[in-house]
């Protein structure tokens, strides 16, 4: 309904329960205006308290989207925040800017910053009594303990793992325009996570922009930039469940300009789907002509992905030709084996992401079944979830808890010691009541609650859980925390775990790829580790690695393409320490990627922390 329909007065304005409901109320022009002005208004009110997103948007709406008038009005009614004294942290320096993993709710077509009710339902005793926070808390040194606390309701972890549904996170890779977002949008639609009404809306919006075939892709690509360019820019994660397993999709960009985003997505996934465009000459442009297919697979192998599904997409464009299927497989398989994948860990599935055949609901025709007798994509994913979940069956109370911080969620509450952090369990398990330490700030916190996100039908459910285990994506509600010194890329660990280092120099077991120039001492590059990127340089070339995987006595002056060596790396322009683990301590967290001049030049494992 248009704004003019309510122009007679504020009394005619409906009551909105949340920000999403208000966004749906706006017409397209109003929504675009709001997206243009709202971020500026929000940024200019960061020093004020007592507002939320909905109240700011309503104020903008009432002032006809006039930023200056809205600011003047709000500053008269809002109170300024008290400026806390900066705590003395274990880690020095200012925050390093990193890109966030965008967690997008598929059940809503317009993103918002609402928090699940459970995250903000509790206040401290002082808040309930109207007392102000005690500033003395923020001037103390961070509290670090090595004595674990007990869970509120202890669970037998081994029994929990055996009874829980398998969980699988997978990243979707492939050359630009291979159909990655369309494929994942079709899968979510077939699973009834997106309903027919929402799909019709996306159909209208895509037709307006002359991109009617993008309706499924727009389920995943929700920003204006992504829709206008027709490529995925950010990393979108979506959660869904079947009766057999739980899943997290990471839809990574395929365009060369956004390879760093793809690296961040790969680092969080258990396995990968490679989406291949089987149309005439399309595979060749992504594979032979310096496309992203090879680079994505090289990154996946380098970052510890061992299991692949090759989604042979757009098979309807070649009339489901077995010859075309086998032709592509014969070119791609030798390359995958050459870079480290085992043939037994690769599944090949013919599909059409747009029509849905071979994805989930729409069965293969009799003609296709004459030459392909394997499962569809969804069944292949479920089988992979069971296979990979067996690796977690050995989890017990003695495995160290390790957690990658992917997002820090702002809280509406004024409690100084509350932090809400989302991320992935890389090892072990965690239960409410247990304590953890966050690195590099080395602050010890108590886990108050654990939340998992799931989507059923048309709604998003945020549920509490008593246990989170390796592989789970969860939000932790922490007490006794300093959220201002927690960042994306930080690591949390059991309080009695002492293997995380904050160092400037370390040794890599490095493998180089195709490079324009050799690596020499002093060569600068960008180091990617997890969701962090950091300028670094070659400090020292130590030795080549021979075929027996041992250090060679041959003198090393420079490192060329496709060579292996032990190399000492030095981080430069360090604004904030990066928590480090060796690959021996954790195989996934100890892996890094090196990029220079827009190209991936090498990858490696941290073998030793030197200083």
Curated annotation (Swiss-Prot):
InterPro entries: G_TR_CS, GTP-eEF1A_C, HBS1-like_N, P-loop_NTPase, T_Tr_GTP-bd_dom, TRAFAC_GTPase_members, Transl_B-barrel_sf, Transl_elong_EF1A/Init_IF2_C. One of its GO terms (molecular function) is translation elongation factor activity. Keywords: Cytoplasm, Elongation factor, GTP-binding, Hydrolase, Nucleotide-binding, Phosphoprotein, Protein biosynthesis, Translation regulation. It is found in: Cytoplasm. GTP binds at residues 174-181, 313-316, 352-354. Residues 251-254 are annotated as: G3. Its EC number is 3.6.5.-. It catalyses: GTP + H2O = GDP + phosphate + H(+). Residues 230-234 are annotated as: G2. The keyword tRNA processing does not apply. The keyword Nucleotide-binding applies. Residues 126-138 have a biased composition (Basic and acidic residues). Changing residue 255 to E: Loss of function. Abolished GTP-binding and ability to trigger the No-Go Decay (NGD) pathway and promote degradation of non-functional rRNAs. Its main location: cytoplasm. Coiled coil: none annotated. Pfam families: GTP-eEF1A_C (PF22594), GTP_EFTU (PF00009), HBS1_N (PF08938). Residues 1-21, 105-138 are annotated as: Disordered. CDD domains: EF1_alpha (cd01883), HBS1_C_III (cd04093). The modification Phosphoserine is found at residue 124. Belongs to the TRAFAC class translation factor GTPase superfamily. Classic translation factor GTPase family. Component of the Dom34-Hbs1 complex, also named Pelota-HBS1L complex, composed of DOM34 and HBS1. Present with 2750 molecules/cell in log phase SD medium. This is Elongation factor 1 alpha-like protein. It comes from Saccharomyces cerevisiae (strain ATCC 204508 / S288c) (Baker's yeast).
């Amino acid at each position: 309904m248009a704004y003019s329909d309510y122009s007679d007065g504020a009394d005619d304005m409906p009551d909105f329960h949340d920000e999403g409901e208000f966004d749906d109320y706006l017409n397209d022009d109003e929504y675009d205006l709001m997206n243009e002005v709202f971020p500026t208004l929000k940024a200019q009110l960061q020093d004020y308290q007592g507002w939320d997103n909905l109240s700011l948007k309503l104020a903008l709406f009432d002032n006809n989207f006039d930023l200056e008038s809205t600011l003047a009005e709000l500053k008269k009614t809002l109170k300024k925040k008290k400026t806390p004294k900066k705590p003395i942290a274990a880690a020095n320096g200012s925050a390093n800017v990193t890109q966030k993993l965008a967690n997008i709710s598929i059940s809503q077509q317009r993103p918002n910053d609402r928090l699940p009710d459970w995250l903000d339902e509790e206040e401290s005793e002082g808040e309930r009594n109207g007392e102000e926070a005690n500033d003395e808390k923020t001037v103390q040194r961070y509290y670090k303990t090595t004595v674990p606390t007990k869970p509120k309701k202890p669970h037998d972890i081994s029994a929990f793992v055996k009874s829980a549904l398998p969980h699988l996170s997978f990243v979707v890779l492939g050359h630009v325009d291979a159909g990655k977002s369309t494929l994942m949008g079709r899968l979510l639609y077939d699973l009834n996570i997106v309903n027919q009404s929402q799909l019709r809306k996306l159909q209208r919006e895509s037709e307006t922009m002359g991109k009617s075939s993008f309706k499924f892709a727009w389920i995943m690509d929700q920003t204006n930039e992504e829709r206008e360019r027709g490529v995925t820019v950010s990393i979108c994660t979506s959660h869904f469940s079947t009766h057999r397993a739980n899943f997290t999709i990471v839809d990574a960009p395929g365009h060369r300009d956004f390879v760093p985003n793809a690296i961040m997505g790969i680092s969080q996934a258990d396995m990968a789907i490679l989406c291949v465009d089987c149309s005439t000459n399309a595979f060749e442009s992504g594979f032979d002509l310096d496309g992203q297919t090879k680079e994505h697979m090289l990154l996946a192998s380098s970052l510890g992905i061992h299991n692949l599904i090759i989604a042979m997409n757009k098979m309807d464009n070649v009339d489901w030709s077995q010859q075309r299927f086998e032709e592509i497989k014969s070119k791609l398989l030798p390359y995958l084996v050459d870079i480290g994948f085992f043939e037994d860990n690769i599944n090949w599935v013919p599909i059409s992401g747009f029509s849905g055949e071979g994805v989930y609901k729409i069965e293969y025709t009799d003609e296709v079944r004459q030459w392909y007798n394997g499962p569809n994509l969804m069944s292949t994913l479920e089988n992979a979830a069971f296979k990979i979940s067996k690796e977690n069956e050995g989890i017990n109370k003695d495995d160290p808890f390790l957690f990658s911080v992917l997002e820090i969620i702002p809280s509406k509450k004024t409690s100084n010691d509350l932090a809400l952090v989302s991320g992935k369990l890389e090892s072990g398990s965690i239960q409410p009541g247990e304590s953890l330490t966050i690195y590099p700030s080395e602050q010890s916190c108590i886990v108050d609650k654990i939340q998992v996100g799931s989507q059923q039908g048309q709604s998003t459910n945020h549920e509490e859980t008593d246990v989170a285990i390796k592989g789970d994506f969860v939000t932790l509600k922490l007490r006794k925390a300093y959220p201002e010194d927690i960042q994306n890329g930080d690591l949390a660990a059991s309080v009695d775990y002492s293997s995380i280092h904050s160092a400037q120099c370390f040794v890599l077991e490095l493998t180089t790829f195709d490079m324009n120039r050799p690596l020499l001492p002093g060569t600068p590059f960008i180091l990617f580790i997890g969701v962090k990127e950091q300028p670094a340089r070659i400090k020292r070339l130590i030795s080549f690695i021979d075929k027996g995987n041992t250090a060679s006595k041959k003198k090393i002056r420079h490192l060329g393409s496709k060579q292996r060596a032990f190399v000492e790396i030095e981080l430069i322009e360090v604004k904030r320490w990066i928590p480090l683990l060796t690959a021996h301590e954790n195989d996934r967290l100890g892996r890094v990627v090196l990029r220079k001049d827009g190209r991936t030049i090498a990858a490696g494992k941290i073998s030793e922390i030197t200083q």
